[in-house]
Design a protein with these regions (language model features):
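Short, basic/aromatic beta-hairpin or loop at an interaction surface
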Residues: 99-115
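Short, conserved secondary-structure segments in the cores of folded domains
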Residues: 72-73, 105, 123-125
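A broadly conserved sequence feature marking short terminus-proximal activation segments
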Residues: 2-46, 151
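Short, conserved beta-turn/loop elements at beta-strand boundaries and strand-helix junctions
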Residues: 85-91, 140
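Residue-level recognition of beta-strand microenvironments
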Residues: 57, 79-81, 85, 122
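Well-ordered alpha/beta subsegment
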Residues: 112, 117-153
């Protein structure tokens, strides 16, 4: 398991953009299994793995040797529906206190896989199972860009 990284307080590619809390946990964008996903996010592209033989999509990412190396990274449309959601009212980490209330969602992509994220640009009253959403990208540092979700209006 990777060590939790935190934003750098001075200089470097992991210095926060905006007012990111200094204890905000950052994903390991250099992990060999997930690096293509994070590279895609930096390029504002939502990437998932697809089996070259069956055409089925896979999430979470698998090692490149899984299924004999048949998986390839492809761009998803970036749209889907809210499969389920929960409203966070208590900060499970101090870094998330200023984000509350936070609508956390599981989005079923049009391609099939389900990704976890949170909603932006709407009130919790507007979030509902079955609502159409699209991905938008939220830069946390120069290297870490998160996929988050907004309602399709």
């Amino acid at each position: 398991m990777s060590e939790v990284r935190r934003p750098e307080r001075s200089g470097g590619p992991d210095r926060p953009i905006g007012d990111l809390h200094p204890d905000y946990p950052l994903p390991d964008v250099d992990h060999p299994v997930t690096r293509p996903f994070w590279d895609g996010c930096r390029e504002r592209r939502l990437r998932v793995q697809r089996d070259r033989e069956t055409g089925s999509f896979h999430w979470p990412p698998k090692p490149s040797t899984w299924k004999g190396g048949r998986l390839e990274w492809v761009d998803a449309k970036g749209t889907g529906t809210v499969y389920t959601w929960v409203l966070g009212r208590e900060p499970f980490l101090p870094a998330f206190k200023d984000l509350l209330p936070l609508a956390m969602v599981v989005v079923e992509l049009d391609e099939g896989p389900r990704l976890v994220g949170h909603m932006v640009g709407c009130t919790p009253d507007e979030v509902a199972i079955g609502r159409r959403v699209r991905v938008v990208f939220k830069p946390l540092t120069e290297r870490v860009v998160l996929p988050v979700w907004e309602l399709v209006r």
